[in-house]
Amino acid sequence: MSEDYIVRAMAADNQIRAFAITSRNIVETARQHHNTSPVATAALGRLLTGGAMMGVMMKGDNDILTLMMKGDGPINGVTVTADSHGNVKGYVGNPNVIIPANYAGKLDVGAAIGYGTLTVIKDMGLKEPYSSQVPLGTSEVAEDLTYYFATSEQVPSAVALGVLMEKNNTVKQAGGFIVQLMPFAEEEVISALEEKIAKITSVTDMLEKGMTPEDILEFVLGDLGVEITDKVPTQFYCNCSKERVTKALMGINKAEIKDMINEGKDIEVNCHFCNTNYNFSVEELKTLRKKY
């Protein structure tokens, strides 16, 4: 299976910056971890794909990006976290959501998420993380990220994200691109870009034709002198461990741990991001209580 990766590029004498990704493995790994329905896979897959690219836009080694789409739809929210090294993870509130296809016969991600808000949090090691919230427009993910870039970061952007499913509900293709205009972009560059982007029907169609992220950016920006500047491997990666979960348990007050011990039953702690369960025996809980 070919590896997932992100390419960065500049075009039109640095008036445009762009990112493109192939993310089939990321989305399939997420599907396997969470056992998501097709529409939940599409929703989570799109946000993971966008989040991975937005993560590598950050400069600091320890920077962390969190994207949260909270709507009134039955999926009960989608959350994704990414770092600046191409690692991304995420989950949905209701992985089993099943809703009818939309008018075009496609998975109805917008209806699954519903009306609500997109929250973007960037933790760059400062005292307070940067946080911004915008209303969801279509709730189809790509348009909502486009709106976020325009309103919160004042960067005109084109975002395209896609997940294509196999008949057996595994992931066939996933990927996307983000193309952004720099503040000094000239009018003719903007027009040429808008014209080209209007011709693009679907990212997954491009991937199905065997196009790589490089090919996609060449197609979108080829007439504008595109130059690939970097290639970054990307993966679904969760950094949870028993040790980290133990630290989280230590944050619970002692009385609660005592109640758990008195019940005399082992407890199970679940990591939302990768759906891994960590078991703690009564003996382990007693040791924890003594230690802290």
Describe every region a protein language model picked out.
Residues 198-292:
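Cys/His-clustered metal-coordination modules, chiefly Zn-binding fingers
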Residues 1-230:
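Interaction interfaces in information-processing and related assembly proteins
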